[in-house]
Amino acid sequence: MTGQSRIGVTGLAVMGANLARNIARHGVPVAVHNRTGARTTEFIEAYGDEGEFTGTQSLQEFVDALERPRRIIVMVKAGKPVDGVITELTPLLDEGDIIIDAGNSHFPDTVRRTAECAANGIRFMGVGVSGGEEGALLGPSIMPGGDPEAYAEVKDVFEAIAAQVDGTPCVVHVGPGGAGHYVKMVHNGIEYADMQLIVEAYDLLTHVAGLDAPAIGKIFEEWNSGDLESFLIEITGKVLAKVDEKTGGPLVDVIVDRAGQKGTGTWTAIDALGLGIPLTGITEAVFARGLSALRDERKKASTTLAGPNPSAAEDRTDLVDDIRQALYASKVVAYAQGFAQMRAASLQNDWNLDLGAMATIWRGGCIIRAQFLNRIRDAYAEHPDLDNLLMVPYFTEAVANAQDAWRRVVVTATEQGVAIPAFSSSLSYYDGYRRERGPANLIQGLRDFFGAHTYERIDAEGSFHTRWAQDGTEVRTD
């Protein structure tokens, strides 16, 4: 081996293979390796003419093929497989070499691996990569976390292979430690909410407006302009328009209504609970997938549990436009919650996340790429310390203009017995967030009664407790 490959990729399933091809297509020599050597051979036979590849059959051969400091991208299944690769690589590497986990790892694992690698003199980076198989090959959104000096060693490669929007590569160093995988996790959580809002709109258009899949597909095609323009809206139109070759009807009508999930939405929701951030849209999207999985139970319940008698919409045109406005307002809330979560995590972990930069790199390559993100980028450019996107004048006005339609949609869905948890929880969050005084004062009173958890007063400093079971007097406890 000559040790002339600039970077290495181990793990040649579709994502790893496409990422390696993308790198090589940009003139960067790449060493490739897979746990099963046959796949490496197949890769070289299939794609060897796309760039300068060095196929290797062992990790030692793979490591020897790389220039120093060695830069190794690991593209294997999250969890124990990543730890296994690191364990095998560590004794083969030298101080200052770089391991880059570009899979969907949970950020606490990335924090742990960073420390473990550092103890052996190895630099570790957790890098979020979004865009699926096509993005990996043609240009993903890349969210690198870890040592900035390590990032400097691969910055030119990442900027070359990332998606480009308005001449700007969709990659930026996110922050230290687990920041990159954290941001990717929240990206995926927002993706859950985005998709749930879309399917709730589809459900309303089907069961309240009485439209079929092709007609709804055309509506989504129309919506894929202006503020709703996005990759997910675009492909929704395509999925709804697809004809099933077997039945001749819409393909979507013969797909089982049970949604899968890989866990990143759950991670996002659990993390938000730990931070104390209300993440209603994303969390309801996760719950909705869980409910969809209870297909056998739902079949039984559909013939047992009572519901309203549905009726056709009186004005279909007005309803369709109301749904469009409700979709946009709910989308604003979902993103506001996701960005608030990233802000809270950044403060807690001292990551110093540039939230405007996150919006910028999500504009291309990734699944949630959307015109809408330009508005978010601009919002953080003007207000870097923004608490909540809803407080930006543009979004404040946009939601205010949509709120009447939004409320009509939630009422109509309730009357018709159509579940829209993401729409309705987003509206509830909006109404709760805009209230100066909510009902949590009673919660504190109840907590103090049964658990002496104390409460604060609006007219005095300090913490107080009422002796409920004794003489009913109030005492200061701090």
Name each region found by the language model:
Residues 1-70, 93-96, 133-136:
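NAD(P)+-binding Rossmann beta1-loop-alpha1 motif at the extreme N-terminus of oxidoreductases
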Residues 35-36, 104-105, 129-130, 417:
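Short, ordered loop/turn segments at secondary-structure junctions
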Residues 7, 64, 82-85, 100, ...:
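Rossmann-fold dinucleotide-binding core
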Residues 54-61, 78-86:
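Glycine-rich, highly charged phosphate/nucleotide-binding loops
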Residues 179, 192-415, 419-420:
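C-terminal substrate-binding/catalytic lobe of Rossmann-fold NAD(P)-dependent dehydrogenases
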Residues 400, 405-478:
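C-terminal amphipathic alpha-helical interaction region
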Residues 30, 55, 124-125, 279, ...:
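Hydrophobic beta-strand scaffold residues
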